[in-house]
Amino acid sequence: MADNDDAAGCPPPAPAPVRRRSSANYRAYATEPHAKKKSKISASRKLQLKTLMLQIAKQELEREAEERRGEKGRALSTRCQPLELAGLGFAELQDLCRQLHARVDKVDEERYDVEAKVTKNITEIADLTQKIFDLRGKFKRPTLRRVRISADAMMQALLGTRAKESLDLRAHLKQVKKEDTEKENREVGDWRKNIDALSGMEGRKKKFEG
């Protein structure tokens, strides 16, 4: 009984620590081949479904082509009615030919208008598509070539006729004659003598020098 009481009062043993797999074990586990999950549909069943889908698509295409042929026949029967040429004279045949030519010209005009509208719509669609690509940043950037160009040619291309005026920087500078520069240098060089003369130090220097 004492043993049973001690066993009941003791806490349950802790579970064994889970051993983590090392990176090498994980790598080996990832690279080793595993059994692929079996598909619920067999290969023969897949082939049968694909064949059935192709047959349905073929029937749909044939039906659409038949509908287009029927619409074309109905349009031609309403627009191109059979001609009644029995008992017509030469003048009446000429009038009929003129009427037919007028109808042909009208149809050509309508066809031209429709083609112009279609071309305009295609151009607008292409422009909108290009704008969408530009906004998304997925447009194809053209390859740029390196071009050697001088500074003068670059300014000429940017400014045009004003390039010469802007490049002529000396025109805005003040022109100084050579005589004026010599005079300024002479005046600057004699500033010590002028100071000595004003302060009365010139005579004292002569006494020391003598």
Curated annotation (Swiss-Prot):
Residues in coiled coil: none
A GO biological-process term: cardiac muscle contraction
Modified residues (Phosphoserine): S22, S23, S42, S44, S77, S150, S166, S199
Modified residues (Phosphotyrosine): Y26
Keywords per UniProt: Acetylation, Actin-binding, Muscle protein, Phosphoprotein
Family annotation (PANTHER family): TROPONIN I, TROPONIN I, CARDIAC MUSCLE
Family note: Belongs to the troponin I family.
Protein's UniProt name: Troponin I, cardiac muscle
